[in-house]
């Protein structure tokens, strides 16, 4: 008859308990708890970096290694988000400006700004639309709307005058006023047509 000694039984039980505890054969799993790391880099199977988190920001990349998204903190302490196109050029910006106001900017595939929606230097809201060369074509803000031609000359102004009355002004191609429709200084309605020949 074979005799199994007590030491072998204890070792067998301990190894079984160790395996069960290591592989987590429990009804509930434990959380990692408080995990502290300086940064996290995410790579695909080929070793191409697909994402990075650390130093106050997060950045993602496409399969070619070009940046696609940046979320982080700027030098002034404000937060911002930048989106990039497939070539790695910035296409959109959402964040905090130098003076603390928020804004959104979009860019074309040449890297030129095409629109701006946000707080201006005068702390009022504004919307600006740019042409493909980056020149202002439309402006809406602080109680008025302006439009510009391809030479940068104002063509339309719609807004409020210093006396509080509304008015519309149109301008010819060289920036000279051609029509005025609005409220005069005496609160009367006025229509003026100018001969700029």
Regions picked out by a protein language model, each given a short descriptive name:
Residues 27-196:
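Parallel beta-helix/beta-solenoid repeats that form elongated, surface-exposed shafts/blades used
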Residues 1-28:
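Single-pass membrane-anchoring alpha-helices
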């Amino acid at each position: 008859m074979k005799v199994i000694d007590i030491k072998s039984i204890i070792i067998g039980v301990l190894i079984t308990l160790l395996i069960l505890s290591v592989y987590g054969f429990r009804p509930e799993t434990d959380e990692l708890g408080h995990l502290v790391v300086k940064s996290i880099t995410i790579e695909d199977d080929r070793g191409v970096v697909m994402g990075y988190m650390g130093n106050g920001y997060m950045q993602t990349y496409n399969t070619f290694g070009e940046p696609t998204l940046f979320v982080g903190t700027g030098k002034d302490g404000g937060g911002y988000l930048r989106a990039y196109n497939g070539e790695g050029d910035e296409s959109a910006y959402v964040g905090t400006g130098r003076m603390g106001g928020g804004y959104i900017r979009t860019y074309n595939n040449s890297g030129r700004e095409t629109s701006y929606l946000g707080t201006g230097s005068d702390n009022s809201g504004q919307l600006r639309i740019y042409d493909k060369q980056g020149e202002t074509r439309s402006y809406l803000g602080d109680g008025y709307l302006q439009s510009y031609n391809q030479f940068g000359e104002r063509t339309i102004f719609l807004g409020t005058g210093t006396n509080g009355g509304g008015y519309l002004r149109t301008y010819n191609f060289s920036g000279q006023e051609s029509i005025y429709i609005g409220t005069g200084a005496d609160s009367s309605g006025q229509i003026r047509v100018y001969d700029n020949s």
